[in-house]
Amino acid sequence: KFHAYSTGWGPWAAPPAAGQILLDLRRMNRILEIDAQNMFAVVEPYVVAGQLQAEAMKVGLNNHISGAGAGTSVLANACCFQGGGPDCMYFASPQDSILSIEWVTPTGDILRTGSLGSGLGWFCAEGPGPSMQGVIRGALGGAGGWGVVTKIAIRLVHWPGPAVMPIEGTVP
């Protein structure tokens, strides 16, 4: 029996019973693409929101930062739990920013949603046929998911500020 869980906070951080394995996706931490013209990014599971934000701002774009902070996974916030935060009024809820998902099922099949599933790239959340987004998200995200998400395309928004945020500070 296979059941995928996020390695985030709470009881999902470790296998809950004997005979189970924990997949460590920590090395899957790359931003695979930032498409400035079409305003989206393709990321792996361990890309954190602050990492994506720093790169997106360089091309005049921005992404959602969850209420848990800039050190949380972009992918996990969008497709594995609610991931809300103070900027949801501007960005919409994270799950509404999903454009396409690639995930591996318990049988080893690779499934792709939206336009990616039709071989047309990462640009659109819905493709021909029924939407599969609800299957991977489940009732509350990863707790109801049916596989391991390996890549996600997430919608970005316009960033009117500087390409690099000026940082100043003093030690007390």
Where are these regions (language model features)?
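FAD-binding subdomain of flavoenzyme oxidoreductases
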Residues: 31-34, 43-45, 49-172
